[in-house]
Amino acid sequence: MPQLSIVIPAFNNSRYLPDCVHSVTHQHFRDVEVIIVDDCSTDDTYEVASQLEHEDSRVRLIQHDKNSGTLASRKTGVLASQGQFVMLMDQDDELADGALQKLIDFGNANPADIYHFGVQVVAANKSAQDAAAGMTSFLTPCARTLHDADILKAQFNTDNGFDWHVHHKMYRGDFARTAYSYAADQRLVLSDDLYMSFIFGTLASTYIGIPDSPWYLYHLGRGDTLGTQLTVQSISTMAQRDAQAFSMVGDFAKRDNILPLRNDWHDRLDDVRNRLIEHAMNEWQDNLPSSDKSEGLQNILTHWQADAVCGELYRYIRDYAYAYLVADNRSSDVAINNRKLANQY
C-alpha cells in the first residue's frame, strides 16, 4: 500500500498533463501512486496518459467509457486508490518540489482527516496577474485546527471560512474513500468541489490548516476564460450548476445514515446557499456586460430565491452609495459613476 495516492481527472487539454504528473513522479519522495482518470477525452489525452503510465509503474490509467463529469472522475479515482493519504490535483496544475515529503511528514506527525495547505498562483496572462493576489489570499488557509461540527460550521462562513476547492488538500485515505462513497452518481462539473467539500466537512473529525505551505502550483488563467466577459448563457449555466450542487448538498443532508449526527443542517445549508448566491452575483456584477445585466439577472432568479438575490443587490447599492458619500470630490467622474450605479441598482 503506497503512503500517498494522487488522483488526477483528465478531459482533453492533454498538453498540460505531463508537467502535472512529472511534478509528482520527479520528487524525491517515491512512495506514491498517481491515478489518471481519462473522462472519455476527444483529443490525445488517453495516448498521453498511456505513455506516462508506460514510463513509470507508479502511474495508473483508468478510462471512462463515456464522459461523466469531474465528480464521477474523481470518485472513480479515489475509490480505486490504496494510499494511506489521498490528494486530488487538476490536470493543468503542479506540485512544488519537495511538497510530498513535507505533507507526508506533517500528516504522520499530526493525525487528521483534512490537511489544508497553501498555493502559489502562477498567472498565465495579464488578467490572471491582476487576480493573483486576491486568489492567493482566498486559497491560503489560516493556521488552525478544527474538530467535528466546527469544521462544517466554519467552512462556508463568510467571516472565517475556508475555500471549498478539493485540491491543495490532503485527506486521510480511508476518510476520502468513505466520503466519495457518499457522492451521488450524477454528472456534475465545476460545482463538484463545493458539493464534495460539504461532504468532507460533514464527515471529518479533524481539520488542520498548515501554515506557510505554498506547495500547490495553481495555474490561473490556463485553459479558462478568466478576464473575458460572460454571456447571458454562461451566467445561466453557472447558476444552474451551482443550484444543482446545492440541491445535491440538500439531498446528502437528508440521508439518515450520516454520522456524526448534527442538528444544525438548516444553518449549514443557509451558509452554502448564501455563498453560492454571492458567487453568482459577483460574476454577474464583474463580468457580464451592462447591456446583458437585466436578462442575466432574470436567469439567476430562475435558480435562486429573489430575497437572497435582492440582498446581494443591496450590498452593491450600499457600497456604491458609501463610496460616493465619502468621496473628497463628489463632482469627480468616479464619484458621479458611483452615484449612478447606486441609483441604477
Model-based region annotation:
Residues 276-345:
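Membrane-interface aromatic/basic loop that binds lipid-linked glycans or pyrophosphate carriers
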Residues 31-40, 60-64, 90-91:
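Short beta-strand/loop segment that forms part of the nucleotide-sugar
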